[in-house]
């Protein structure tokens, strides 16, 4: 018994592109309350989102028979998830130095504005993702999955 792969684009379903719905929703809610003043803080939350993803099927392991999973490569979720991941990486836009020299007032103001802009972008992307998940987009259950990738059983002998 296995999935009947008939097209190379079906291999994507076996990758680590699935998340449990409740942990994903909880992560969105938790992330909305986080502070993003340093790159380390942004990296931590980005890693928490990345850690939610796993592979749930293999060519010979069937999709779970109960519940749904979030498919982050879905047409609705993928652009939101990718934009969220990109919004966490602001290294090239926010200069964080540990030098003892005192920055000028304008340098401080510019850096503060960039941090604030990054925080707004992150929160905005999280809110968009949470909204789509709350509206039921991006989920897949076994029946929906197997409509795309049929499960074949061994012929009776």
UniProtKB/Swiss-Prot annotation:
<keyword id="KW-0167">Capsid protein</keyword>
<dbReference type="Pfam" id="PF00721">
    <property type="entry name" value="TMV_coat"/>
</dbReference>
<keyword id="KW-0007">Acetylation</keyword>
<comment type="similarity">
    <text>Belongs to the virgaviridae capsid protein family.</text>
</comment>
<keyword id="KW-0946">Virion</keyword>
<keyword id="KW-1139">Helical capsid protein</keyword>
<dbReference type="GO" id="GO:0019029">
    <property type="term" value="C:helical viral capsid"/>
</dbReference>
<protein>
    <recommendedName>
        <fullName>Capsid protein</fullName>
    </recommendedName>
</protein>
<dbReference type="GO" id="GO:0005198">
    <property type="term" value="F:structural molecule activity"/>
</dbReference>
<dbReference type="InterPro" id="IPR001337">
    <property type="entry name" value="TMV-like_coat"/>
</dbReference>
<dbReference type="InterPro" id="IPR036417">
    <property type="entry name" value="TMV-like_coat_sf"/>
</dbReference>
<feature type="modified residue" description="N-acetylserine; by host">
    <location>
        <position position="2"/>
    </location>
</feature>
<comment type="function">
    <text>Capsid protein self-assembles to form rod-shaped virions about 18 nm in diameter with a central canal enclosing the viral genomic RNA.</text>
</comment>
């Amino acid at each position: 018994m296995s999935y009947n792969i008939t097209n190379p684009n079906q291999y994507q379903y076996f990758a680590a592109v699935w998340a449990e719905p409740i942990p994903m929703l909880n992560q969105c809610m938790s992330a909305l309350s986080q502070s993003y003043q340093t790159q380390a803080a942004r990296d931590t939350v980005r890693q928490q989102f990345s850690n939610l993803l796993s592979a749930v099927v293999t060519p010979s392991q069937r999709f779970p028979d109960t519940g749904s999973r979030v498919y982050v490569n879905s047409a609705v979720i993928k652009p939101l998830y990718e934009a969220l991941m990109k919004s966490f990486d602001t290294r090239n836009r926010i200069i964080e130095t540990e030098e003892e020299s005192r920055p000028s007032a304008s340098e401080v103001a510019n850096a503060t504005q960039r941090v604030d802009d990054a925080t707004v972008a992150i929160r905005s992307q999280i809110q968009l993702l949470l909204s789509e998940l709350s509206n039921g987009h991006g989920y897949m259950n076994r029946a929906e999955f197997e409509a795309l990738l049929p499960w074949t059983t061994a012929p009776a002998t």
